[in-house]
Amino acid sequence: MKLDWMSFTFALRNLLRQKGRTGMTLASIVFGVVGLILSGGFVEDVFIQLREATIHSRLGHLQIYREGFYAHGSKEPYAYMIEDPAAVEAKAAAVPGVVDTMKRLNFFGLLNNGKTDLPIIGEGVEPAKEAKLGSFFFIIEGRQLTDDDAYGVLLGEGVAKSMKLEVGSFVTVLANTPDGALNSLEFEVVGVFRTFSKDYDARAVRVALPAAQELLGVAGVHAVVVSLADTLTTDATAAAMKAAIGGDGYELKTWFELDDFYAKTVDLYKSQLGVLQLIILVVVLLSVANSVSMTAYERVGEFGTLKALGKRSGDIARLIILENALLGLIGATLGVLLGIALALGISAVGIPMPPPPNSNVGYTALIRVVPSVILVSFFIGFLATVLSAILAARGAARVPVVEALRQNI
């Protein structure tokens, strides 16, 4: 049997003649494709939202340090200062794709509320620039730190709760200077913040950069944080920036290198998605195989008649495969269309999600329409149907003519 237009027409008529079986098989294919599109789109949204929360709550897209700071800076913070941050910022800002740069000065110290002390991680920041970056840096009490707050301080949510502090309270921050002396400054609490990391919120405080430099008795900074227009250009921009500043005794880290939690989460979800895809593939394969096999069994008499009229076993097998290839094509296409429609509809409403591990911040999940997921889902639905048809066709085509014709009696 040649695969011409008449063959396709004949196959389509056979599908329409078996409306019940065709409908059951279509439903199985559509269900599988829709399930893959929705699950893949949901996981992709988790990746995107976690990525952007990581970047825009604290890390930025890139961070530039003095060479050796990332490996040894926690032990010798003052040995790896950027003494001329303006020059570094100028070079970084000249790289295409960079939106903004901001300086940070890190320190360890003690926070005193007049009664008790709490070890803290402090950051001296440029408030106006940080406010633009921090779309996932939530002020839950008070207000954002501003450039006019010479001695204002933002407290992490955990710090404020542990020390029983509120907006308007005064605290003392103590830290060691480069020569080993202990220095202190008094600050007024202007706000309480919450980020995507509960551990960070439990120890972090932020003050204006000049106040941090006064507290530590230094003029430099530890890091220059870089914000980009598009997260997807991070690697390319990092490569260009390394070429611009790498030979001057500086090192550069991307947000991905600074946060291993994201990498572990992505690996976990990809493994789970892979298992889910395998389960859906098996379910679709078994459902379609059962439906196709039943249809082929019910049509054994018809196949016997075709053989009696001169058709060969190969012709019968090709007919069954062609019919189900058309069915798989139609079912996968319908599944894609329905999956996209459901993804857009669900995203319009949103899915309220609880805070992930190590976070106090819940979020609204979406179902992303991801071209690669749609393509994979389409081919899984189509190939599962064709594979099932091949298995059924081998059995149906081998039935002897006499035995097949006996089914017509």
Task: Indicate residue ranges for each PLM-predicted region.
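Mechanotransmission and gating elements of multispan inner-membrane complexes involved in transport
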Residues: 177-273, 280
